[in-house]
């Protein structure tokens, strides 16, 4: 018996049903990699950030997430280079979907019980997505903006429903807009922490404050 089409599980009808000690025997999700590209790139290297945002309240299968990830990555590697971007999948398939298997062979009516005891067995996993929630995000340099938008446009065809491509005003994956980020960086208020930054506050323990002030003055 083949896999049931994902259109049967498109809508969020029931409560979240995650894997637990009560829900065992769940198949592994098809998507296993959620960050790819130049993951270790400094926060200063990739100021551009583009999101693929869902426009519907629905469920996306782990197979669809994997297909979208592969499609986006393949286009960017071919047109930009493998070290010119960082893709991050923003959804994780935690919701378990079930299937009540029915026999379709001859004499099946004597073997199966129909809708008696119809609570199905786990079949796969999906991610529940809300309206306005990012599905995947890409950070890169400003010169690759057109290529990043085209890669996300191609990835849209792997998902059901409607999606929008949103060019963020923020610097990379940080929470600061570009003007604010550059201003805080000039003041020495930001400390690089991988693909994000940590803010150095004006308040706190006196020793920590003196240490931060000394570093800012040295900068």
Swiss-Prot record:
Query: Does this UniProt record's set of keywords contain Nucleotide-binding?
Result: no
A Gene Ontology biological process in which this protein takes part is: translation
Question: Which branch of life, at top level?
Answer: Eukaryota
> Per its UniProt record, what InterPro entries does this chain match?
Ribosomal_uL16, Ribosomal_uL16_CS_euk_arc, Ribosomal_uL16_dom, Ribosomal_uL16_euk_arch, Ribosomal_uL16_sf
**Keyword line:** Ribonucleoprotein, Ribosomal protein
GO MF, one annotated term: structural constituent of ribosome
Q: Which CDD domains match?
A: Ribosomal_L16_L10e
Q: Does the keyword rRNA processing apply?
A: no
State a GO cellular component annotated for this protein: ribosome
Q: How does it assemble?
A: Component of the large ribosomal subunit. Mature ribosomes consist of a small (40S) and a large (60S) subunit. The 40S subunit contains about 33 different proteins and 1 molecule of RNA (18S). The 60S subunit contains about 49 different proteins and 3 molecules of RNA (28S, 5.8S and 5S).
Q: Which PANTHER family match?
A: 60S RIBOSOMAL PROTEIN L10
What the record says about family reads: Belongs to the universal ribosomal protein uL16 family.
- Protein name stated in the entry: Large ribosomal subunit protein uL16
Q: Which organism is it from?
A: Bombyx mandarina (Wild silk moth)
Organism lineage reads as: Eukaryota, Metazoa, Ecdysozoa, Arthropoda, Hexapoda
**Name of the encoding gene:** RpL10
């Amino acid at each position: 018996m083949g896999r049931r089409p994902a259109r049967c599980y498109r809508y969020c009808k029931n409560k979240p049903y995650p894997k637990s000690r009560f829900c065992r025997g769940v198949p592994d999700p098809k998507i296993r990699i959620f960050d790819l590209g130049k993951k270790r790139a400094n926060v200063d290297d990739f100021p551009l950030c583009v999101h693929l945002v869902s426009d519907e309240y629905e469920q996306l299968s782990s197979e669809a997430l994997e297909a979208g990830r592969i499609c986006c990555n393949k286009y960017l590697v071919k047109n930009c280079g493998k070290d010119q971007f960082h893709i991050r999948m923003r959804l994780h398939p935690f919701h378990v979907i079930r299937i009540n298997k029915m026999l379709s062979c001859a004499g099946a009516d004597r073997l199966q019980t129909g809708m008696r005891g119809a609570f199905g067995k786990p079949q796969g996993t999906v991610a529940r997505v809300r309206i306005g929630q990012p599905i995947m995000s890409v950070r890169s340099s400003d010169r690759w903006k057109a290529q990043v938008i085209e890669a996300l446009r191609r990835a849209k065809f792997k998902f059901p429903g409607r999606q929008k491509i949103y060019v963020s005003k923020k610097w990379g994956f940080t929470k600061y807009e570009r003007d604010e980020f550059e201003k805080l960086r000039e003041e020495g208020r930001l400390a690089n922490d991988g693909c994000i930054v940590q803010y150095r506050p004006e308040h706190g323990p006196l020793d920590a404050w003196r240490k931060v002030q000394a570093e800012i003055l040295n900068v």
